Amino acid sequence: MLKMTDVSKVYPGGSVALQNVDIHIEPGEFVFVVGPSGAGKSTFIKMLFREVLPTTGSIFVNGVDILSLTPNEIPYMRRQLGIIFQDYRLLPDRTVYENVAFAMEVIETPRRKIKRRVLNVLDLVGLRHRANAYP
């Protein structure tokens, strides 16, 4: 489970990246973060895995306040998240299907569930016909 409550990020100089964001994502849900350039997408994602800290608010992953984690605990928390980045950090030796399935394989999701979810996501974004292609 991922929960952000009243999260804001203001960069030095006063540039507001996010303001009063509230979101609750249940385990197994797929979420797509889309929007125009400068909307705060990258800041939002970077906060989820604690590369950037919010100015205000709280962020919980599976009931753990990630803002209180020590530097040694952060990598373990990150393993609980599956994120595909805007800059296309895809695995070049894996197919589109395998790239989408990768995070679920790491957390040992059953194969049938992975197949169903991956195909649903590929259908949703119109890429099922490219499932066996390489990036």
Where are these regions (language model features)?
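ABC ATPase NBD coupling module
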Residues: I66-G82, R111
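ABC nucleotide-binding domain "signature motif"
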Residues: T55-D65
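Interfacial catalytic loop of ABC nucleotide-binding domains
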Residues: L69-N72, R116, N132-Y134
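Short coil-to-helix segment of the ABC ATPase nucleotide-binding domain corresponding to the Q-loop/switch region
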Residues: R94-F102
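Conserved ABC ATPase "signature" region
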Residues: V64-D65, A101, E105-E108, R112-R130
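The feature captures the beta-strand-to-loop junction immediately N-terminal to the Walker
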Residues: V34-P36
